[in-house]
């Protein structure tokens, strides 16, 4: 999928004072986002808002196989994440983000394959906002990509105990496998296309070790002032 993201017609890419943490569902993004944000004294922007009632309803219906809700979920999540990212960057303080809109397109492609017309609409919207992000707002200065093995993914899903994921796991397993098979490669290619500095990390490493590896990269490459 990333090969379709052609920056040839784009202006010079802008780089924001931000770090993004990306990866498969259950990879430990939120945990690492929190730990890294605390270590860097940075603003932290999480993907999920547990108090967002609409988000929770759409997510539940998505895992129950409701195709209409899947479309609404993707659009709602995309718009919310874009605005959260924009607001975070406008604060001018170093920010750590739990996922970005670059990953939304992968989820939409997986969830909306049954409706190519709606995906075409979504894709056009995604590209318009992505152009705004890359040369008006700014891409993350560093993208951390968590690599999660399938068995570990399954174990974590059941361990964290979200009913919407567990109750419908057998039905959604083909979707999860398809997503898992392409996730890391998709993110790596996306970073390469847009010239985003990235680091692939083993999700099975202790969080403290992951943070140390990230800090070593930041310091050795002098990515952020004062770190």
Question: PLM ranges: what are they?
Answer:
Residues 69-137:
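Glycine-rich phosphate-binding loop used to anchor ATP phosphates in small-molecule kinases
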Residues 38-81, 107:
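Conserved substrate/cofactor phosphate-moiety recognition/catalytic segment
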Residues 29:
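Conserved lysine of the Walker
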Residues 21:
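Hydrophobic anchor at the beta1->P-loop junction of P-loop NTPases
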Residues 106-182:
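A glycine- and Lys/Arg-enriched "phosphate-lid" helix/loop adjacent to the NTP-binding pocket
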Residues 32, 36:
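Hydrophobic positions on the alpha1 helix immediately C-terminal to the Walker A/P-loop
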Residues 24:
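P-loop (Walker A) phosphate-binding loop of NTP-binding proteins
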Residues 3, 154-227:
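NTP-dependent small-molecule kinase module
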């Amino acid at each position: 999928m990333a090969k379709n993201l052609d920056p040839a017609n784009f202006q010079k890419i802008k780089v924001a004072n931000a770090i993004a943490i990306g990866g498969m569902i259950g990879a430990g993004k939120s945990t690492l986002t929190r730990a890294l944000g605390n270590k860097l004294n940075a603003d932290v922007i999480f993907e999920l808002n547990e108090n967002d009632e609409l988000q929770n309803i759409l997510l539940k219906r998505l895992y129950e196989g409701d195709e209409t809700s899947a479309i609404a979920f993707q659009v709602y999540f995309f718009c919310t994440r874009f605005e959260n990212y924009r607001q975070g960057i406008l604060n001018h303080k170093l920010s750590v983000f739990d996922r970005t809109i670059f990953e939304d397109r992968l989820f939409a492609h997986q969830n909306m394959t049954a409706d190519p017309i709606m995906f075409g609409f979504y894709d056009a919207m995604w590209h318009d906002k992505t152009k705004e992000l890359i040369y008006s707002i700014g891409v993350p200065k560093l993208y951390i990509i968590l690599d999660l093995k399938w068995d570990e993914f399954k174990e974590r899903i059941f361990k964290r105990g979200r009913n919407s994921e567990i109750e419908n796991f057998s039905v959604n397993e083909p979707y999860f496998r398809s997503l898992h098979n392409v996730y890391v490669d998709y993110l790596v290619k996306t970073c390469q296309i847009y010239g985003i500095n990235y680091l692939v990390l083993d999700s099975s490493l202790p969080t403290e070790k992951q943070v140390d590896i990230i800090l070593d990269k930041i310091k050795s490459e002098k990515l952020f002032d004062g770190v």
